[in-house]
């Protein structure tokens, strides 16, 4: 029995949730999720788990076969158009046809011309294909992949934690964290999925962060710890980054500062130091981000800096996704740093406008997922 058409969004939403399990593991390929539905129930699921591994459709089909499902009676929901070319794996279209699946529901088309054409191939073989279900959500799933088709820089996730009145920390000298335990654990899981964690010099000096993933289940390599700063720290500074893991530290600084004695001492310590051009807002972050992907293979960069860095990134169009953790607390202290600051705004038309993509709870906090409008 074919699923009712009003159930298509529900099953596609399930496929999208499954797809997110692969985030950070599939680059430079996209995250893709698939579910197989029979008689109104999900009977199998699969996702693209790692780069070079089987695609979501193949994993879902394998799951269904292990469960003894009759694939000819199933509808396949997949967030991205099935690929139709030989790459590291055979075409998913051929796996679908070989399985005898007769109905496929697709979220969005593949923006990669080398892999596109799957919808036409399936239709030519007599498969019913429905496309465009939850298309905006499915396009958001591959926002990083779409960026990589046209840009040489990594996908940038800007993470901020703030109180209800927009403060990211108490005033200087006052200890305390804004977000709760669940939100902090979520951040460490996120760090395990990115190639680098980036902060500004102010955050380095004020917070002395480790910039590591300390999730108990994390077993992979640590992300690069990146600091964007016009003035480098001295090699003997009591910073956790320099004392514990200098070999994974990257400093993005000005061209002049990269030739300083401080830079030489950091290089001797095992750090990487790169000199970049400057403008009124600081060092050239766009070039620095491109360098991280080119030289260090960073497809995703998580930015956890302060309000000035955050505002500069959003204003420059370099923040592809903003992850805002909001704590149900109010500081009411004008001396406490704000989540976005440093800009001069003369009217509301100068405001940076974002689009709310999703909301989830991390009790007692909430997480807002925003994207450029």
Residue map of PLM features:
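Short low-complexity, flexible loop/linker segments enriched in glycine and/or proline
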Residues: 119-121, 144-147, 213-214, 289-291
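Zn2+-dependent cytidine deaminase-like catalytic core
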Residues: 36-137, 224, 250-257, 312-314
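Structured loop/turn residues at beta-strand edges in well-structured enzyme cores
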Residues: 69-72, 99, 151, 192, ...
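A short, flexible N-terminal coil/short beta segment enriched in small residues
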Residues: 15, 40-46, 137-150, 242-245
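Enzymes that bind and transform nitrogen-containing heteroaromatic metabolites
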Residues: 2-30, 45, 88, 155-157, ...
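Proteins enriched for Cys/Gly/acidic motifs involved in redox and nucleic-acid/cofactor modification
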Residues: 25-26, 52-53, 119, 133-161
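Helix-turn-helix
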Residues: 33
